[in-house]
Amino acid sequence: MTKYKVGMVSLGCDKNRVDSEIILGKMSSEYEITNNAKEADVIIVNTCGFIESAKQESIDTILEMAEYKNNYNCKLLIATGCLIQRYGDELKNLIPEIDIMLGVNDYNKIDRVITEFIEGNKEASKLLNYSDENINEGIRILTTQKESAYIRIAEGCNNFCTYCIIPKIRGKFRSRRMENIISEATDLASKGVKELILIAQDTTQYGSDIYGKKNLHILLKELSNIEGIKWIRVLYCYPEAIYDELIEEIAANDKVVKYLDIPIQHISDHVLKLMGRKTSKKDITDKIEKLRNKIPNIVIRTTFIVGFPQETQEDFEEILEFLQEYKLDKVGVFKYSREEDTPASKMDGQIDESIKEEREEKLMLSQEKISNNINKLKVDKKYDILIEEYDGEFYKGRNFEMAPDIDGNVFLESPKKLEIGEFVKVKIIKNMDYDLIGVVEDESCK
């Protein structure tokens, strides 16, 4: 009997990507996985519902895939993810072409629901259960480059920032058992993964719920014992939760890259308070100084939200002054998105879109100069580069300072063929604002 083909469109963050990979893993025994949606009998759209632009992209994608039911092979359209969890009832009426809807806590039921739907049980077509207990786990079909993989170490969030809807969608913070994470990481390493990227809504809180204290430093130590893993990268570390044992482990552990993603979001105490952030400008700057003192070569990445309600020009200029003083290595900027059902959406002093855009542009231009100056200092230095792509002329890879998708890349030529997924020693010969150009010094640095 010919297997049905399943295609997946995954939108949103890397945490959503992990969900998509778990769904594909769940379906892989009964269905053939295809990257071509036009030939898929079953199409799954895993949506994002975090900000307005992401919601619109999700709706547009579902509508596009709905057309595949008329023009291509699609017989079953499934919508999952945060947008569905949040707006499932409305979307079912808006887009009747959706056959099955699954919320963020029901992925483990997807194969059963499809079978029941095909057999005529239409009541199974909408599962939007809310749970503060469930964590999606299971065998994954990786959608990243084979040498890197994300590992979600916790689900949900307890921070309740005033602009964010995630706790209402994903539930309270809950850590995965350490042995389950180690088992998954070991399996990934056996399949050729060399870089583990740890993610959660707040990675620094790992273990605080199930072990009674923060245990990220212990998890890092355990993961570093896995044969084949060369890099371990940590994203989404809330500044107020970064603790001394974690800093010490990052400093001492050769496999943990000296890179931290710390979502600051703002530096003005006035705006931080409005955001419901549990930190202050002094706490943030003290933490940065401690990190740089204990780990001199650490790369710090952060994100800022501009145009938050009641943000004054003085508040915004505090960010500019902060960046000029602390010169963070990597910075992302987002315009505030007014999300319904959040406290911030009801605040007075909403900022005009034109002012948000102006502040976003000004902040990015400022950081572009900082980034260029930082990259100039890398010229003539040598780095281990993880090779990820080859376009027929140039190889593309990353050094430890670069996370996939969100940071820059290293481009290089090589007279000899390089293997995708291998590490090579590269000398940097030229810099750009965010990218670097290098030449191969040694073919391998295993």
Curated annotation (Swiss-Prot):
Molecular function terms from GO: 4 iron, 4 sulfur cluster binding; aspartic acid methylthiotransferase activity; metal ion binding; protein methylthiotransferase activity
InterPro entries found in the cross-reference section: Elp3/MiaA/NifB-like_rSAM (IPR006638), Methylthiotransferase (IPR005839), Methylthiotransferase_CS (IPR020612), Methylthiotransferase_N (IPR013848), Methylthiotransferase_N_sf (IPR038135), NA-bd_OB-fold (IPR012340), Ribosomal_uS12_MeSTrfase_RimO (IPR005840), rSAM (IPR007197)
Amino acids binding [4Fe-4S] cluster 1: 13, 48, 82
Positions bound to [4Fe-4S] cluster 2: 157, 161, 164
Keywords, alphabetical: 4Fe-4S, Cytoplasm, Iron, Iron-sulfur, Metal-binding, S-adenosyl-L-methionine, Transferase
Protein localization: Cytoplasm
Catalytic activity line of the entry: L-aspartate(89)-[ribosomal protein uS12]-hydrogen + (sulfur carrier)-SH + AH2 + 2 S-adenosyl-L-methionine = 3-methylsulfanyl-L-aspartate(89)-[ribosomal protein uS12]-hydrogen + (sulfur carrier)-H + 5'-deoxyadenosine + L-methionine + A + S-adenosyl-L-homocysteine + 2 H(+)
Note accompanying the cofactor annotation: Binds 2 [4Fe-4S] clusters. One cluster is coordinated with 3 cysteines and an exchangeable S-adenosyl-L-methionine.
GO biological process: tRNA modification
SMART domains, sorted: Elp3
Segments forming domain MTTase N-terminal: 4-119
KW Nucleotide-binding (keyword) present: no
Keyword 4Fe-4S annotated: yes
Record's function text: Catalyzes the methylthiolation of an aspartic acid residue of ribosomal protein uS12.
Family assignment from sequence similarity: Belongs to the methylthiotransferase family. RimO subfamily.
Record protein name field: Ribosomal protein uS12 methylthiotransferase RimO
